[in-house]
UniProtKB/Swiss-Prot annotation:
SS bond list: none
Family of the protein in this entry: Belongs to the opacity porin family.
Gene3D superfamilies: 2.40.160.20
Taxonomic lineage: Bacteria, Pseudomonadati, Pseudomonadota, Gammaproteobacteria, Pasteurellales
Cellular component GO terms, alphabetical: cell outer membrane
Originating gene: opa
Protein name: Protein opa
GO molecular function: porin activity
Length: 121
């Protein structure tokens, strides 16, 4: 969900990053994206993201049958392109990198690629 002014978009999101070894990671974020005007159906974009990420873990070896959670500040970058279809519809493809925070002295990163279809109001 977001808002667009000129070539700049601002969006909020919820992301479930997954679960690994009893640790579930999810986040609430905000992104600022810039759309390059190419005067064609293809519109490249770049952006940055900040998020608060919750690391929720259960049944850790040193604390059997206990659960806890930590909140970490994260950041990321995104790049991609939109392809104008019909009317307000568009196809979208992009890549992203998110630094989710440190967990037990380990840097936790998320890389991804996305494709989708959108509708602009």
């Amino acid at each position: 969900m977001g808002y667009k002014v000129g070539n700049t978009r601002v969006a909020g999101d919820y992301t479930h990053h997954g679960k690994v070894d009893g640790t579930k990671i999810q986040g609430l974020g905000a992104s600022v994206l810039y759309d390059f005007d190419t005067n064609s159906k293809v519109q490249p974009y770049v952006g940055a993201r900040v998020a608060t990420n919750q690391f929720k873990y259960t049944n850790r070896a040193e604390q059997k049958f206990k659960s806890s959670s930590d909140i970490k500040l994260g950041y990321g970058v995104v790049a991609g392109a939109k392809y104008k279809l019909d009317g307000n519809w568009y196809a979208n493809g992009g890549v992203e990198y998110n630094r989710l925070g440190n967990f037990d002295s380990t840097k936790v990163n998320n890389y991804g690629a996305k494709v989708g279809v959108g509708y602009g109001f």
